[in-house]
Amino acid sequence: MSKTFWMICAAATFLTATMARAAEPACDRGCLEGFMNQYLDAMVAHDPSHLPVTPTVKFTEDDVALKLGDGLWGTASGRGVYREYFDDPEEGQVAFFGTLKENGHGIALALRLKIENRRISEAESVVVRSPRTFDMMEKAGAPDPVLLETVPQADRLSRTQLTAIANQYFEAIEQGNGKVAPFDADCNRFENGMRTSGALGCSAQLDTQVFNYISRIFPRRFLVVDSDRQVVFGFFMFNHRGDVLWVNSPGEGKHDMMGAAKRPFSVDVGEAFRIKDHKILKVEALMTALPYGAKSPFVPQE
């Protein structure tokens, strides 16, 4: 047969495959959460061999690049009760806050997966090995209902608007000014399972400059936008130089900085923001301390 014939056959095969991929339905909420559960179940079984992954799948744990199947994959021994999902069908990404057992001990996990052509191409995780965090999340049992509400289409903000509002939260922290970000009067913040916004609330607490020991929040990676529930999730690096020795809080005067902050360190934070009526209503975070200057393998290195 002629060379032209084989070229036509090859072109037809390529076109058919392309059309098949185009006709494949998008990975919706159920699909994304299915991938997440499949991943977590495989982790507990210590067996990634049957996971649908791309040939170049990238896996990190606490900002260290590992081979899929290493790290927590070798020590996870069961799933907990608390399970919270953030779904972004438009970008093919899904995030998770939840509890697990590691060799019988309770831990918490922030995890993000990227799905491309029905295969996992990225898996990024932060592990919180704290029995207290595990216990508090297990006691809660389930996410706050406000994080599970499907917001009417007419009341939804765009992806750009949601991300911009969440970013103002970090600006407010860096500036020590709660008025920089649009906080709802009922805003609460939970970190590693514990409410940390205190009696003052999200905005007024920042005005005390209690977070002035945080030198810089960078990079700020907004990765999952759950438009249906108006939630933004990402991973963010809090960097602390350790050179702030005291704080001058309005109305409280000068007082010493807590000892734990008087050293250089960074904190990798998986954080979610529920936005309602253009304001931050709820902040949830799981975080772990890292050496100062730590960088995510998912961020281009300088």
Spans of features found by a protein language model:
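Bacterial N-terminal signal peptides that target proteins for export
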Residues: 1-8
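Domain-scale selection of a single, long terminal region
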Residues: 3, 17-18
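Bacterial N-terminal signal peptides
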Residues: 8-17
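C-terminal and inter-domain tail/linker signature
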Residues: 21-302
